[in-house]
């Protein structure tokens, strides 16, 4: 088999992504030889102009596409979100592979956590639009004002700019940080160590798709080839993830309907789950139309129509009714207070009613947005949420390393992969044993 030439941008992240694709090809074609080619693009050279103000589209991809057309490379690996929604003739996106995390990541200086007026670095109109309201509620300091400032450069450059500036935080694609941290090659060990070292002075927050849908195709890699290169296309058919391809095409089609381009203030994410699929859409069109949809479509095998015609879920005889009261469990606050350097998964906000303190070395994750906002109102920094998808469909994580997780819930909580700390229990009563405090 011929040597397969893979071209990408020169950035640390772009080279990691090219190598991920190269390794995937070698899994199916172990005798192949891979050659990596790196190239600066217009977007890499002009680091001053905000992306949404650049006069041309495809500033990170057009120069690389030319190398394909000139037969200098066999395939190009892009961050798919960098590609224009309209592809020019001569090349096609032939494949993609498993998608990384779709979500955005906020990194925030620890020294800025209590500030009421904060500034965040991002050049994305979408992020500015959707985070300007959510972060006012989600940050424990309850800031009065958020100012956004444009920033350019690769991931390490952007983090350095944050640490050397008066800005308080930086928003970027979580997939970028994940790929850098998870990279096991020695090619970029120095850069990886620099990133991890910066995180010692930073808090982080994974931003939920229900409130901040990603850019279409975020987290996905586009593998571009010449349209007539049947040999390379046949190779890529073996590694293509058709489900991811379908999700990305759906996201890009929705953005295209509103005009397309990185200047749009629109986020759209399509997630494939074991139980169905979710479409998150939020932002504002150029005509001022506000968009906000979170649509779940279950798989047929998970639909349950048995309760569809039930009109009354209460017992016909009131004497058969049961009443429940919530009682705190003694010593649970003491147990939780002693936990450090672990993950705390909070199933609902009232599971922490009696909890005044959680060590700041811990990661806090919530079951949904409502619980997140309740905890932030009490001054807790929340790192992320399962976004009401369940702890198995959207599990908690520490982006920097593996840790032990504890689940804060009631004493009859279902079996979990986490160690459960029961902070309350439900006590049932009948109409005959109901305490006087419940009687009106």
Predicted segments with their positions:
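Ser/Thr/Gly-rich flexible loops in soluble cytosolic domains mediating phosphotransfer, phosphorylation
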Residues: 94-123, 199-211, 359-391, 427-429
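A conserved helix-loop-strand patch within extracytoplasmic ligand-binding domains
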Residues: 80-81, 87-146, 203, 393-400
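Immediate post-signal peptide segment of exported/extracytoplasmic ligand-binding proteins
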Residues: 1-5, 113-116
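Short, well-ordered beta-strand segments
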Residues: 5-7, 76, 94, 120-121, ...
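Alpha-to-beta junction loops
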Residues: 69-78, 165-170
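Small-molecule-sensing regulatory modules
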Residues: 2-49, 53-54, 61, 128-129, ...
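Signature of uroporphyrinogen-III synthase
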Residues: 21, 288-432, 437-440
């Amino acid at each position: 088999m011929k040597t397969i030439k893979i071209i990408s941008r020169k950035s640390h992240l772009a080279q990691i992504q090219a190598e991920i694709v190269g390794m995937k090809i070698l899994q199916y074609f172990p005798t192949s030889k891979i050659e990596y080619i790196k190239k600066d693009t217009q977007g890499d050279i002009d680091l001053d102009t905000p992306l949404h103000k650049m006069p041309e589209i495809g500033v990170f991809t057009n120069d690389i596409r030319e190398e394909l057309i000139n037969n200098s490379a066999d395939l190009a690996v892009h961050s798919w979100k960098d590609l224009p929604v309209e592809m020019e003739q001569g090349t096609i996106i032939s494949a993609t592979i498993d998608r990384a995390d779709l979500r955005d990541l906020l990194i925030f200086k620890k020294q800025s956590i209590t500030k009421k007026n904060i500034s965040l670095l991002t050049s994305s109109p979408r992020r500015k639009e959707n985070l300007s309201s959510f972060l006012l509620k989600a940050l424990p300091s309850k800031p009065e004002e958020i100012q956004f400032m444009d920033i350019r450069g690769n991931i390490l450059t952007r983090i350095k700019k944050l640490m050397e500036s008066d800005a308080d935080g930086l928003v970027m694609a979580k997939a970028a940080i994940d790929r850098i941290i998870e990279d096991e090659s020695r090619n970029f060990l120095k850069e990886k160590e620099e990133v991890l070292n910066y995180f010692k002075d930073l808090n982080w927050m994974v931003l939920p798709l229900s409130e901040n849908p990603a850019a279409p195709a975020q987290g996905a890699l586009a593998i571009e080839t010449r349209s007539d290169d049947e040999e390379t296309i046949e190779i890529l058919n073996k590694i293509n993830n058709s489900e991811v391809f379908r999700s990305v095409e759906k996201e890009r089609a929705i953005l295209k309907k509103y005009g397309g381009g990185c200047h749009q203030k629109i986020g759209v994410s399509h997630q494939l789950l074991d139980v169905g699929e979710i479409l998150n859409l939020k932002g504002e069109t150029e005509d001022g139309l506000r968009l906000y949809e979170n649509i779940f479509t279950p798989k047929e095998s998970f639909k349950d129509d048995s309760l569809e015609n039930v009109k009354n879920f209460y017992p016909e005889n009131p004497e058969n009714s049961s009443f429940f009261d919530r009682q705190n469990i003694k010593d649970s606050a003491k147990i939780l207070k002693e936990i450090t350097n672990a993950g705390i998964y909070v199933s609902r906000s009232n599971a922490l009613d009696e909890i005044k303190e959680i060590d700041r070395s811990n990661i806090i994750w919530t079951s949904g947005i409502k619980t997140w906002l309740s905890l932030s109102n009490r001054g807790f920094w929340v790192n992320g949420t399962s976004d009401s998808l369940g702890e198995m469909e959207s599990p908690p994580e520490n982006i920097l390393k593996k840790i032990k997780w504890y689940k804060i819930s009631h004493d009859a909580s279902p079996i979990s992969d986490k160690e459960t700390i029961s902070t309350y229990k439900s006590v049932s009563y009948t109409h005959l044993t109901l305490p006087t405090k419940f009687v009106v």
